């Protein structure tokens, strides 16, 4: 058995560094979680342009945050958006695994199960996050920016394809549908409790604890 993991919102919660950065930069009383959700929507609208180098990282950061605030009838300046982005990146570089997720990787190591990470994103940013989560990166890391393909493209999943490979991710379309169409077994980490067709998904888990239990089951433990 081999297990590859998505990074963002699977091994850690994307919302956590956003929340901490907001608390440091802005004083406005607002539903921070809803603001974050809005920012993710606007991020996804133009993220492919960023990956294709049509826009800069700063332009992406300004766009997603200003648009999200605008939905709350609040205007912020480009400078405020960039100040937030700087603090946000700092918080992203100081993320950590939960205690149970640490157990997951301790178990995989002890049982000598091959594992790795497959993620979309820019190489430098993703490596920075992984270094924050793991003391030593002694496993394969596949990043879309480096290999030239991105989820849900079949080609990126074929890099890990094997009869006994499982892919763990929170994304329904880019992770589960993408991996499944490439012939890879899937574990959907549905921590948002989305209502979707799961008939083609091998396992659905809703917490770190459930993920650990499924992995033990797959390893006949």
Model regions and ranges:
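Active-site neighborhood of HAD-like aspartate-dependent phosphohydrolases
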Residues: 1-41
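Asp-based, Mg2+/Mn2+-dependent phosphohydrolase catalytic module
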Residues: 3, 122-221
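An amphipathic alpha-helix signature
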Residues: 18-23, 58-66, 123
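Short, surface-exposed acidic
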Residues: 28-39, 71-84, 136-138
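A metal-dependent, Asp-based hydrolase signature
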Residues: 45-85
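Short, acidic loop-to-helix structural element flanking the phosphoryl-transfer center
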Residues: 58-59, 78, 86-116, 154
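Conserved phosphate-coupling serine/threonine residues in phosphotransfer and NTP-handling enzymes
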Residues: 119
């Amino acid at each position: 058995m081999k297990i590859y993991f998505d990074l963002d919102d699977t091994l850690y919660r994307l919302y956590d560094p956003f929340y901490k950065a907001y608390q440091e930069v802005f004083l406005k009383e607002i539903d921070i979680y809803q603001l974050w959700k809005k920012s993710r929507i606007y991020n996804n609208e133009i993220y492919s342009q960023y990956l294709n180098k049509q826009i800069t990282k700063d332009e992406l950061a300004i766009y997603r945050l200003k648009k999200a605030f605008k939905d709350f009838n609040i205007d912020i300046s480009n400078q405020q958006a960039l100040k937030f982005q700087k603090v946000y990146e700092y918080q992203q570089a100081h993320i950590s695994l939960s205690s149970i997720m640490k157990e997951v990787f301790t178990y995989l190591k002890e049982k000598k199960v091959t594992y790795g990470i497959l993620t979309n994103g820019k190489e430098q940013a993703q490596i920075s996050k992984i270094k924050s989560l793991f003391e030593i990166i002694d496993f394969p890391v596949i990043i879309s920016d480096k290999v030239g393909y991105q989820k849900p493209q079949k080609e990126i999943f074929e890099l890990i394809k094997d009869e006994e490979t499982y892919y763990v991710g929170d994304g329904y379309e880019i992770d589960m549908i993408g991996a499944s169409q490439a012939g890879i077994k899937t574990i959907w980490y549905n921590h948002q409790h989305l209502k979707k067709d799961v008939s083609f998904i091998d396992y659905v888990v809703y917490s770190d604890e459930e993920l650990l239990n499924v992995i033990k089951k797959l390893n006949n433990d």
